[in-house]
């Protein structure tokens, strides 16, 4: 029995128990052997936050043959099942943050230590990097991101559609005013021309198939990547719908495309594929819950044996101390496991599965940039001391951030129609900017949020909490009225890479668990104390970004008087009609609106990717140079950051790394040959073929089949069950399949043919036969196959039926031909009646085949033509083969002319099946 849901002071932790396992449960499961296979972990993902969850989910969904196990280790607890803004307003955001050692003047708070991490409370802004922002990125990687992975990640987080939850007169008027203002370059010289920007994702990715892993987890197919077809052209009518225009609107196509570029690229899915609920604002937790549910469903129960069948386990509240490595003879470093400390402060080692078939297990570091770097340094400071470790922690980059909040009269919005509408409305817009500094373009953008057109009432805070992208701006937005609109222009700008004043090192002063914590130093550009060449560029970039905010603010004010909110000291500063950008800057100087560097929590770069091991830390797939199997899946990989939030790019890289691990690194099922000529596969070892099979058996019996490593493996200790191919019945056929037993003393199973649908009531004659033998078909419909079809037996022990009488003796003796491997079960085969000296009747012509040997694949060829049955048994290793039985059916009630095919799960007798073919 597994750990039950625990009672806290206020709640019953059913969701945490559903999602998570204890460390002991995970370690115990790894010691179990299932179908002759050890069940150690093939991939250990360190970090259950945003990118760890994405990576692990992708690994799970990519595994088409169910061949590997994934373990997620998270130091924080489980707190929320989805993004905080998808839930009722509770007056704030979750704050399970843990600080790290840092430069004393910067005061970092740390990231969310919880399953889902930053994705539980982020703002959702997800613009894509421009081509020019991929500074120092490997070209092959950039090409793959643009050709495939940005589309996939956009679909996954919900940024590939327009924001149809942000609409209304306010939004339309603000967008039009901004569009008109940016149309004159002199008005906003720091803005990039809309014509020079790529189309909105809703246009770029229109018509492309869904890649969202939530849909895949719900049964929409495997997670394997497929080529992306060219996007069809979006019609003018569709553009009008995306923009909220009337069908009669005459705006030109080029203007509509440019207007869409001003739409905020928010990770909010309000519409989904048919049959799938939208997830609203993206968080990695719902997807993790989906795959955890799938893993639990596959396991068929609770407890150690069931946990061993689980392909994914999540263990929270576990601190990873370091990664265990060994240096090979070729000087490459291989990871063999991880060392952790459990909730009882006991250190334990979780080993990785050993190499198999030329492939190996892997560890994926998926923490935030700071903690990923700490773990990498603590692990590799010696083994990679003269190599990648000497660069780890350098290239720390984050974002420059400023906030300008203004309140304008609604009369400033020249295209806002007169209306009696009084609903509280919100708007979200996006402007990209750049400035050429030191001979190179430096990029930034504005995230524009607005609210207004109604007086705020007692529920307005809760309403705005749901409507605005950034909950940090909630207080500012509460200044909106029915006569005024509040607008916050948040500037986000890139920092220059490879700044020697920005780095992470292991703290010389502070340690936890005898291991140094991360000490963070980030160039202090805000106060100007850092004067490196990179910092001086960043100062100019920050000025240009703030200048763009002023330019856009003046566009919105449209010559009307307005207020600056939350200026120095929290004051409100009135601005006169006709104010200029120079006057705005004088009234609210740039330094007064700037946040400290790093407060965006967009830290990145410290384990950056590159093709040259001498100048980077990881390769283009995130593997740490000179290691064989240690990967990173986090923004720490970014060579440069650009201005976008790292979410979209981080998700894309996580998917790409998971795809590589699936295709080229992790252990997998042995590749099987294609079906023989003329045969079609009923089960070919893939998830797609497994979905066509259905289980019949006693409810909640725990007797079933696990799909593992491309095989169907029986398990359980209850009444037998039946797994059958559901889509089709068969008349005359040649069925070929392979099976393997594991215990010579317990190897009972069988192959059923020509039986009726077990979910449909049998004809009276068969129901009466079942009743006569004391069988309740309603309690276990698997018995339907016994009475309506025929079973080709698997049991070299030929165990007798304890409930059967054999010519006056009970129980039935062991060893009868009619109960032996290769026989049609229970059809008389001329067996000796030892107590009478006579023989049973001989209805089937049975001859024993080659012995069934544990661990050896045996093959059945079952040929059925009309009422004629012929079975051949072959030892696939020795080649020994024998026709074991020939049988002509004369029972008109059994063996329907068109029947189903299935395999049996017998109590306490594990048997594996593969390559189930038919012609």
Where are these regions (language model features)?
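FAD cofactor-binding and catalytic pocket of flavoenzymes
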Residues: 389-392, 398-543, 600-605, 615, ...
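Carbohydrate-interacting regions of secretory-pathway proteins
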Residues: 671-919
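A glycine-rich dinucleotide-binding beta-alpha-beta segment and adjacent secondary-structure elements
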Residues: 315-316, 321-324, 544-639
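N-terminal Rossmann-fold NAD(P) dinucleotide-binding loop
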Residues: 52
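Conserved redox-cofactor binding core of oxidoreductases
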Residues: 2-9, 141-320, 326, 335, ...
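Extreme N-terminal leader/targeting segments of oxidoreductases
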Residues: 1-42, 61-67, 663, 667-670
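Redox-cofactor-proximal catalytic regions of oxidoreductases
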Residues: 82-85, 90-186, 217, 490, ...
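Glycine-rich loop(s) and the adjacent beta-strand/alpha-helix scaffold that form part
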Residues: 60-88, 323-328, 339-431, 634, ...
């Amino acid at each position: 029995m597994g750990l039950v849901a625990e009672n806290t002071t206020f709640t019953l932790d059913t969701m945490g128990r559903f999602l998570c396992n204890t460390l002991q449960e995970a370690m115990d499961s790894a010691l179990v052997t299932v179908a002759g296979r050890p069940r150690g972990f093939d991939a250990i993902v360190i970090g259950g936050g945003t990118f760890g969850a994405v990576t692990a989910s992708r690994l799970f969904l990519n595994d088409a043959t169910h061949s590997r196990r994934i373990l997620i280790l998270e130091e924080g607890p489980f707190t929320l099942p989805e993004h905080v803004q998808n839930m009722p307003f509770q007056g704030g955001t979750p704050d399970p943050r843990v600080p790290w050692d840092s430069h004393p003047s910067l005061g970092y708070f740390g990231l969310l230590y919880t399953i889902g991490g930053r994705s539980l409370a982020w703002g959702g802004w997800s613009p894509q990097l421009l081509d020019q922002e991929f500074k120092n990125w490997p070209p092959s990687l950039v090409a793959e991101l643009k050709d495939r992975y940005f589309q996939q990640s956009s679909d996954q987080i919900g940024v590939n559609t327009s924001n149809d939850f942000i609409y209304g007169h306010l939004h339309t008027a603000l967008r039009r005013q901004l569009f008109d203002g940016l149309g004159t370059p002199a008005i906003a010289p720091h803005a990039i021309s809309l014509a020079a920007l790529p189309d909105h994702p809703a246009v770029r990715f229109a018509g492309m198939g869904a890649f969202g892993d939530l849909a895949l987890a719900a049964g929409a197919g495997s997670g394997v990547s497929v080529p992306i077809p060219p996007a069809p052209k979006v019609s003018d009518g569709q553009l009008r719908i995306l923009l909220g225009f009337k069908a009669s609107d005459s705006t030109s196509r080029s203007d509509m495309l440019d207007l869409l570029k001003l739409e905020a690229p928010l990770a909010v899915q309000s519409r989904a594929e048919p049959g799938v609920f939208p997830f609203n604002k993206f968080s990695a937790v719902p997807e993790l819950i989906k795959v955890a549910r799938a893993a639990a469903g596959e396991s068929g129960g609770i407890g150690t044996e069931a946990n061993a069948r689980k392909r994914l386990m999540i263990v929270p509240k576990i601190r990873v101390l370091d990664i265990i490595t060994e240096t090979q003879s070729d000087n490459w470093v291989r990871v063999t496991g991880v060392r952790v400390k459990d909730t009882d402060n006991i250190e334990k080692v979780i080993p990785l599965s050993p190499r198999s078939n030329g492939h190996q297990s892997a560890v994926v570091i998926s923490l935030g940039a700071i903690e990923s770097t700490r773990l990498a340094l603590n692990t590799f400071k010696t083994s990679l001391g003269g190599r990648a470790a000497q660069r780890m922690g350098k290239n720390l980059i984050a974002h420059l951030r400023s906030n300008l909040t203004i309140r304008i009269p609604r009369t400033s919005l020249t295209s806002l129609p007169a209306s009696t509408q009084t609903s509280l409305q919100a708007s979200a817009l996006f402007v990209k900017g750049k400035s050429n500094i030191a001979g190179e373009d430096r990029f930034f953008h504005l995230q524009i949020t607005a609210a207004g057109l109604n007086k705020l009432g007692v529920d307005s805070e809760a309403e705005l909490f749901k409507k605005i992208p950034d909950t940090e701006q909630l207080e500012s937005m509460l200044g909106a009225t029915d006569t005024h609109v509040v607008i916050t222009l948040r500037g986000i700008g890139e920092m220059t890479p490879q700044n020697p004043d920005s780095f992470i090192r292991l703290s010389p002063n502070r340690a936890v668990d005898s291991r140094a914590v991360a000490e963070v130093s980030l160039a202090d550009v805000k106060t100007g104390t850092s004067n490196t060449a990179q910092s001086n560029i960043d100062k100019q970039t920050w000025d240009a970004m703030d200048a763009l905010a002023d330019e856009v603010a003046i566009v919105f004010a449209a010559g009307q008087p307005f207020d600056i909110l939350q200026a120095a000291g929290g004051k409100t500063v009135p601005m006169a009609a006709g104010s200029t950008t120079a006057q705005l800057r004088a009234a609210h100087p740039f330094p007064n609106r700037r946040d400290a560097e790093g407060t965006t929590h967009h830290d990145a770069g410290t384990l950056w990717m590159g093709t040259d091991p001498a100048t980077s830390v990881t390769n283009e797939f995130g593997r740490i140079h000179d290691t064989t199997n240690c990967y990173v899946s986090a923004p720490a990989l970014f060579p440069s950051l650009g201005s976008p939030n790292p979410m979209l790019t981080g998700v894309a890289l996580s998917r790409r790394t998971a795809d590589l691990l699936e295709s080229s690194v992790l252990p997998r099922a042995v590749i099987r040959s294609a079906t023989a000529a003329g045969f079609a596969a009923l089960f070919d070892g893939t998830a797609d073929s497994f979905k066509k099979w259905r289980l019949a058996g006693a409810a909640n019996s725990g007797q079933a089949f696990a799909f593992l490593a491309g095989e169907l493996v029986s398990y359980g200790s209850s009444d037998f069950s039946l797994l059958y191919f559901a889509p089709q019945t068969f008349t005359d056929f040649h069925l070929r399949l392979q099976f393997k037993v594991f215990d010579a003393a317990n190897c009972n199973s069988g192959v059923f043919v020509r039986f009726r649908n077990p979910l449909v009531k049998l004809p009276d004659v068969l129901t009466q036969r079942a009743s006569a033998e004391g069988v309740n078909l309603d309690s276990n419909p698997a018995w339907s196959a016994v009475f309506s079809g025929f079973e080709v037996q698997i049991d070299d022990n030929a165990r007798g039926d304890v409930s059967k009488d054999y010519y006056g003796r009970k129980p039935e003796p062991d060893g009868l031909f009619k109960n032996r491997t290769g026989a049609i079960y229970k059809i008389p085969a001329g067996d000796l009646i030892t107590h009478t000296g006579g023989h049973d009747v001989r209805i089937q012509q049975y001859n024993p085949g080659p012995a069934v040997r544990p661990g050896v694949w045996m093959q059945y060829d079952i040929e059925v033509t009309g009422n004629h049955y012929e079975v051949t048994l072959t030892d696939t290793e020795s080649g020994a083969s024998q026709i074991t039985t020939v049988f002509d059916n004369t029972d008109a009630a059994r063996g329907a002319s068109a029947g189903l095919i299935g395999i049996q799960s017998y109590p306490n007798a594990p048997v594996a099946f593969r390559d189930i073919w038919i012609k």
